[in-house]
């Protein structure tokens, strides 16, 4: 059996946390041969609820769980962490402007970045799940100057999985028969789910669906799926978000399947004309615990306009919190 690794989860008593922790504990994220120590962070007023989740985790008697820490201290939760899932974030309240939401979360993620900088493993892998995820990842990264900027990512795997589901439903195939889908940009309504390099059962997707459907139905449906789930369920997507977080971390840690890519929001290196430093979703491959942006894809005018629109939104978000960045 391997030595245990430390997995920190913030917002651990919340809905996504509840859907996430039992699957991590069962080995679905890092493998059935990888023991884990769970380091769970919650705000003081949620500590009792967190204890309830810890009791349930204990009652599962998971063979892979080496230990559980529950705390309201970021330093304690992040100490020597190998993997960190930043799930906890301030939700948007009634009448709250996006700028207010950005500022409220900037305070949370600045403090968490500083704690990671102080106590986490130097090769820690960090995933921002809580929204606005891309900008929260950027704020965390900027507050952890001693860590590699590439260690900080944001989740667009939920958008990627949503796009797979819409496309497979449309053509009547299984999602595993789709290759080459990409989600570009921000985890927001400006994201661009792109099928232009996509194949379904080995044939170009563009030959199997009409462009009008892609433009008028597919893209808006994926962009608005989160809102549609809130309307239907009366609560935001939790289980699907947790599942996507596991997918993201599993691929980053263990690698993407040979010949396939996925979508991750990572620091731009200037690829595809996207401003360097923005946390932007690209198609990536993962190998040996590292990710690489897929290079050399052609970009037509339709894609370019959408890729630039979502980049502009990310630049606006960054500028809105610039006074709070180190």
Swiss-Prot record:
Task: Tell me where on the tree of life, at the top rank, the source sits.
Answer: Bacteria
Q: Name one Pfam family in it.
A: Ldh_1_C
Q: Which UniProt keywords apply?
A: NAD, Oxidoreductase, Tricarboxylic acid cycle
| Catalytic site | 187
Binding-site list for substrate: 92, 98, 131, 162
Task: Extract the InterPro entries matched here.
Answer: L-lactate/malate_DH, Lactate/malate_DH_C, Lactate/malate_DH_N, Lactate_DH/Glyco_Ohase_4_C, Malate_DH_AS, Malate_DH_type2, NAD(P)-bd_dom_sf
- Gene3D superfamilies associated with the record: Lactate dehydrogenase/glycoside hydrolase, family 4, C-terminal, NAD(P)-binding Rossmann-like Domain
- Write down the species: Halorhodospira halophila (strain DSM 244 / SL1) (Ectothiorhodospira halophila (strain DSM 244 / SL1))
Write down what this protein is called. Malate dehydrogenase
Q: What is the lineage of its organism?
A: Bacteria, Pseudomonadati, Pseudomonadota, Gammaproteobacteria, Chromatiales
| Catalytic activity entry | (S)-malate + NAD(+) = oxaloacetate + NADH + H(+)
Q: What's this chain's function? A: Catalyzes the reversible oxidation of malate to oxaloacetate.
């Amino acid at each position: 059996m391997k030595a245990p690794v430390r997995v920190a989860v913030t917002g651990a008593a919340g809905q996504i946390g509840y859907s996430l922790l039992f699957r991590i504990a069962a080995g679905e994220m890092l493998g059935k041969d990888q023991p884990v120590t769970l380091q769970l962070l919650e705000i003081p007023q949620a500590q009792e609820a967190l204890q309830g989740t810890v009791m349930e985790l204990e009652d599962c008697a998971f063979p892979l769980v080496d230990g559980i820490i529950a705390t309201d201290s970021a330093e304690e939760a992040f100490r020597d962490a190998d993997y960190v899932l930043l799930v906890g974030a301030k939700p948007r309240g009634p009448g709250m402007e996006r700028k207010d939401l950005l500022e409220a979360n900037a305070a949370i993620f600045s403090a968490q970045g500083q704690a990671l900088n102080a106590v986490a493993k130097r090769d820690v892998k960090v995933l921002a799940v809580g929204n606005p995820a891309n900008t929260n990842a950027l704020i965390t990264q900027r507050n952890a100057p001693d860590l590699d900027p590439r260690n900080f990512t944001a989740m667009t795997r939920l958008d990627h999985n949503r796009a797979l589901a819409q496309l497979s439903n449309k053509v009547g195939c299984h999602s595993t028969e789709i290759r080459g889908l990409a989600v570009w940009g921000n985890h927001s309504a400006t994201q661009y789910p792109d099928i232009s390099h996509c194949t379904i059962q080995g044939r170009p997707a563009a030959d199997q669906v009409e462009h009008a459907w892609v433009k008028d139905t597919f893209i808006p449906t994926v962009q608005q799926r989160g809102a549609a789930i809130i309307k239907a369920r009366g609560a935001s997507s939790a289980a699907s978000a947790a599942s996507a977080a596991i997918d993201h971390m599993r691929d980053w840690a263990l690698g993407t399947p040979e010949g396939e890519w996925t979508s991750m929001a990572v620091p731009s290196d200037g690829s595809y004309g996207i401003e360097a430093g923005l946390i932007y979703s690209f198609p990536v491959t993962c190998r040996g615990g590292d990710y690489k942006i897929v290079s050399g894809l052609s970009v037509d005018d339709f894609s370019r306009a959408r890729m630039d629109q979502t980049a502009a939104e990310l630049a606006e978000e960054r500028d809105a919190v610039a006074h709070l960045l180190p």
